[in-house]
Every structure is written in structure tokens, then in C-alpha cells.
Regions:
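Glycine-rich phosphate/diphosphate-binding loop of Rossmann-like nucleotide-binding domains
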Residues: 52-64, 148-182
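Glycine-rich nucleotide phosphate-binding loop and flanking beta-alpha elements
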Residues: 30, 111-112, 171
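Phosphate/diphosphate ligand-binding glycine-rich loop within oxidoreductases
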Residues: 41-147
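Alpha-helical scaffold segments in soluble metabolic enzymes
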Residues: 21-28, 96, 116, 141-148, ...
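A generic local structural motif
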Residues: 33-37, 90-93, 175
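Active-site-adjacent beta-strand anchor residues
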Residues: 12, 107, 167
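Positively charged, low-complexity intrinsically disordered leader regions
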Residues: 1-60
Length: 182
């Protein structure tokens, strides 16, 4: 997968090699996350967080990561604060917002809505959760954590048994995690 300029809509986009590259990159970024190294690699770049459903961890983690790498973050956390409330289409909202952003992370209550938004965007869009459909970034984080925990015990993720507990029918993160575990 070519990452530069690409949307992240579904965990199905990633092959095993892609996931391994993401994890290698994540490992290289740990010193920046821990603040033992500083960088301004994203200086001048703007992330727009568009979260139309409640979020603490996803919204804050994307924003914090972008800030740590030197970028700026714009937050929209309520649909009522946008022209969508007045009937503007996702297409039009996407066209406008992508003119002011370098990348957009979006969470929306309707399955498929983030993909619709991304199709109209002029900048990359990351799915931060769309209804009960998918949450690819959470699945990648969960898999990364499982892998690191197993490795700390001298084991690998190959042939590991993973138990999933919680809302298995409507939990978008679980849906994405099940796909990537296969």
C-alpha cells in the first residue's frame, strides 16, 4: 500500500507487510511520544478532527500525536456546530474542510459515512469510527499492543488465541480487530 496521500477507511486495506511497516514506524516514534526526542516534522500542517460521536481516546490521541510532531489541530466535536445541521451534504462539508486541512480524522454515527466523506475530500481521511462498521486505527493499536505484550513474554502473535469481550455485534473496533486477526 502506498501510504502517502492515502485514506485509511478499512482495515481490509492493509496487507501483512503494511501492518509490519506501520508497527516498525510506531516503534521509531516512541522516543517522540515519550518526549525524549523532539521534532517539528509536521510544522505548518493542520489536522482536522471531525468527531460527531463522543470520543476521548481516539480524538485526543490523534491530536496529541500531531501536536508532538509539530502540527496544529482543529477540533469539531458536534454536528450541531457545522453546516451539516442546516442540511449541508457530507460531500460539500468534505470539499470545504479539505481546503483548510492537510489531513482529516473523522468519526460519524453512520456506517459508510467516513468513506463517503473521504471520496469527496482533497486530503487524506482517516476513519476514526463509522457507526457499527469499522475503526481501523483502533484495531491497529490493539494488534500492536497484543503483539508487544506477547513479545515481552517471549511469544509471537502467530497462532495466539485472542478472546474478545464486550459488544461484539455493534462494536466497530471489534469488527476491525477480527478482520486483522484473520
Amino acid at each position: 500500500m502506498e501510504f502517502l496521500g492515502s485514506n485509511i477507511i478499512s482495515i481490509n486495506q492493509f496487507k501483512k507487510d503494511d501492518v509490519e511497516l506501520i508497527f516498525e514506524t510506531a516503534n521509531k516514534l516512541i522516543p517522540f511520544a515519550n518526549r525524549s526526542k523532539l521534532t517539528k516534522v509536521l510544522d505548518g500542517a493542520i489536522l482536522s478532527n471531525m468527531f460527531f460521536e463522543p470520543s476521548t481516546r481516539t480524538r485526543i490521541s490523534f491530536g496529541s500525536a500531531f501536536n508532538i510532531l509539530g502540527g496544529s489541530v482543529r477540533e469539531t466535536t458536534e454536528m450541531d456546530s457545522t453546516s451539516l445541521k442546516k442540511g449541508e451534504s457530507l460531500y460539500d462539508t468534505s470539499r470545504v474542510l479539505s481546503g483548510y486541512s492537510d489531513i482529516i480524522v473523522m468519526r460519524h454515527p453512520l456506517a459508510g459515512s467516513v468513506e463517503e466523506f473521504a471520496n469527496a475530500s482533497r486530503v487524506p481521511v482517516i476513519n476514526g469510527g463509522d457507526g457499527d462498521n469499522e475503526h481501523p486505527s483502533q484495531a491497529l493499536l490493539d494488534l500492536y499492543t497484543i503483539k508487544k505484550e506477547l513479545e515481552s513474554r517471549g511469544k509471537t502473535i502467530d497462532n495466539a488465541r485472542v478472546a474478545l469481550i464486550g459488544d461484539l455485534k455493534y462494536g466497530r473496533a471489534v469488527h476491525s480487530l477480527c478482520k486483522i486477526l484473520n
